[in-house]
Amino acid sequence: MAKSVLKAAPVVVGLTALMERHADALSSQLQAHHLKVFPPHSEKGIRTFGPSEASKLLGVGESYLRQTASEMPELNVSMSPGGRRMFSIEDIHVIRKYMDQVGRGNRRYLPHRRGGEQLQVISVMNFKGGSGKTTTAAHLAQYLAMRGYRVLAIDLDPQASLSALFGSQPETDVGPNETLYGAIRYDDEQVAIERVVRGTYIPDLHLIPGNLELMEFEHDTPRALMNRKEGDTLFYGRISQVIEDIADNYDVVVIDCPPQLGYLTLSALTAATSILVTVHPQMLDVMSMNQFLAMTSNLLREIENAGAKFKFNWMRYLITRFEPSDGPQNQMVGYLRSIFGENVLNFPMLKTTAVSDAGLTNQTLFEVERGLFTRSTYDRALEAMNAVNDEIETLIKKAWGRPT
């Protein structure tokens, strides 16, 4: 008679230990992937631009760009294999400054804020993941900087996807007190906001990175409310307070908000002059946005009653991941326009493999090389992205009272 073989009892692993183990394993693999894509001595950067794209970024005709470039012998412009001039983002930055100095008439080529124009703080938000919130914030910040504005991008999402897109890995490149939390925390370890601002590979675009440390603000705030002293700034005013300290350095601040309604998001809303809500045109996403709007309005009413003051210029809904050939999506877009009217941006951001494939290597459309895609795929994606960002730039100009 064969002896029965006793099977060893399965090892019971605690949930906390299992999640820690998986987090460590995934973190090390992500770091290895980052090093493979961007070796230690390589740097992220914006691709070069031909004369047509460069002239559009500068807001001039190609002939004037050629004439100006010929007047600048110090300009070392690269050449394409076909013999075309290719301009780096640094070249465009230098040319813009030169044009502003020697330009004819009253034409201004540096679009910096002028006397009386208020710093524009745009909070990009949504309650539901997958709406393209971070992709929108990243491309908007880069586009405005490439157009000559002085831009600060703030990653307020503990997942820190915006930081990763800009080359700052949250696990390895962002230390304690190096997120916005360091500048808005309640204790004696608070630092000046200048300490957490870092440069990027685009002239006049700065970043305040994020990581999981931002969650500490959600934990600290209830204690701070209980132990509040006379003169303490409440949670909803802390972001606007520190932004005010560096307002003179920037024209636009773009905040990538967390995908939930916590103290961080409410503070970002209070600091904002404008709100951009991303929405995927499907029923579940729209239902989620309805809950988001209802909860947000209730909470903002409570904050207003507590003394908060809002500096509001505009609020817009951006349709994202839009497929023009999808009938139900077109119906949903029409439904949203019938309810919200002009508060829905005219141009949607299309669903395209160019954006998703660029994201696999933590790059934006302005960074990834056009040659990696079929020309029609890339050009279609870039045209849609530029149309969205140009419409937002127009809203910024209107808020300043400038002609558009």
UniProtKB/Swiss-Prot annotation:
Gene Ontology biological process terms, A to Z: DNA replication; plasmid maintenance
Keyword Disulfide bond: no
Source domain of life: Bacteria
Transmembrane segments: none
Keywords from the UniProt entry: DNA replication, Plasmid, Plasmid copy control
SUPFAM superfamilies recorded: P-loop containing nucleoside triphosphate hydrolases
UniProt entry tagged with the keyword Ribosomal protein: no
Function: This protein is coded by a hairy root Ri plasmid. It is possibly involved in regulating the plasmid copy-number.
The name this protein goes by in its record: Putative replication protein A
Organism of origin: Rhizobium rhizogenes (Agrobacterium rhizogenes)
Gene giving rise to this polypeptide: repA
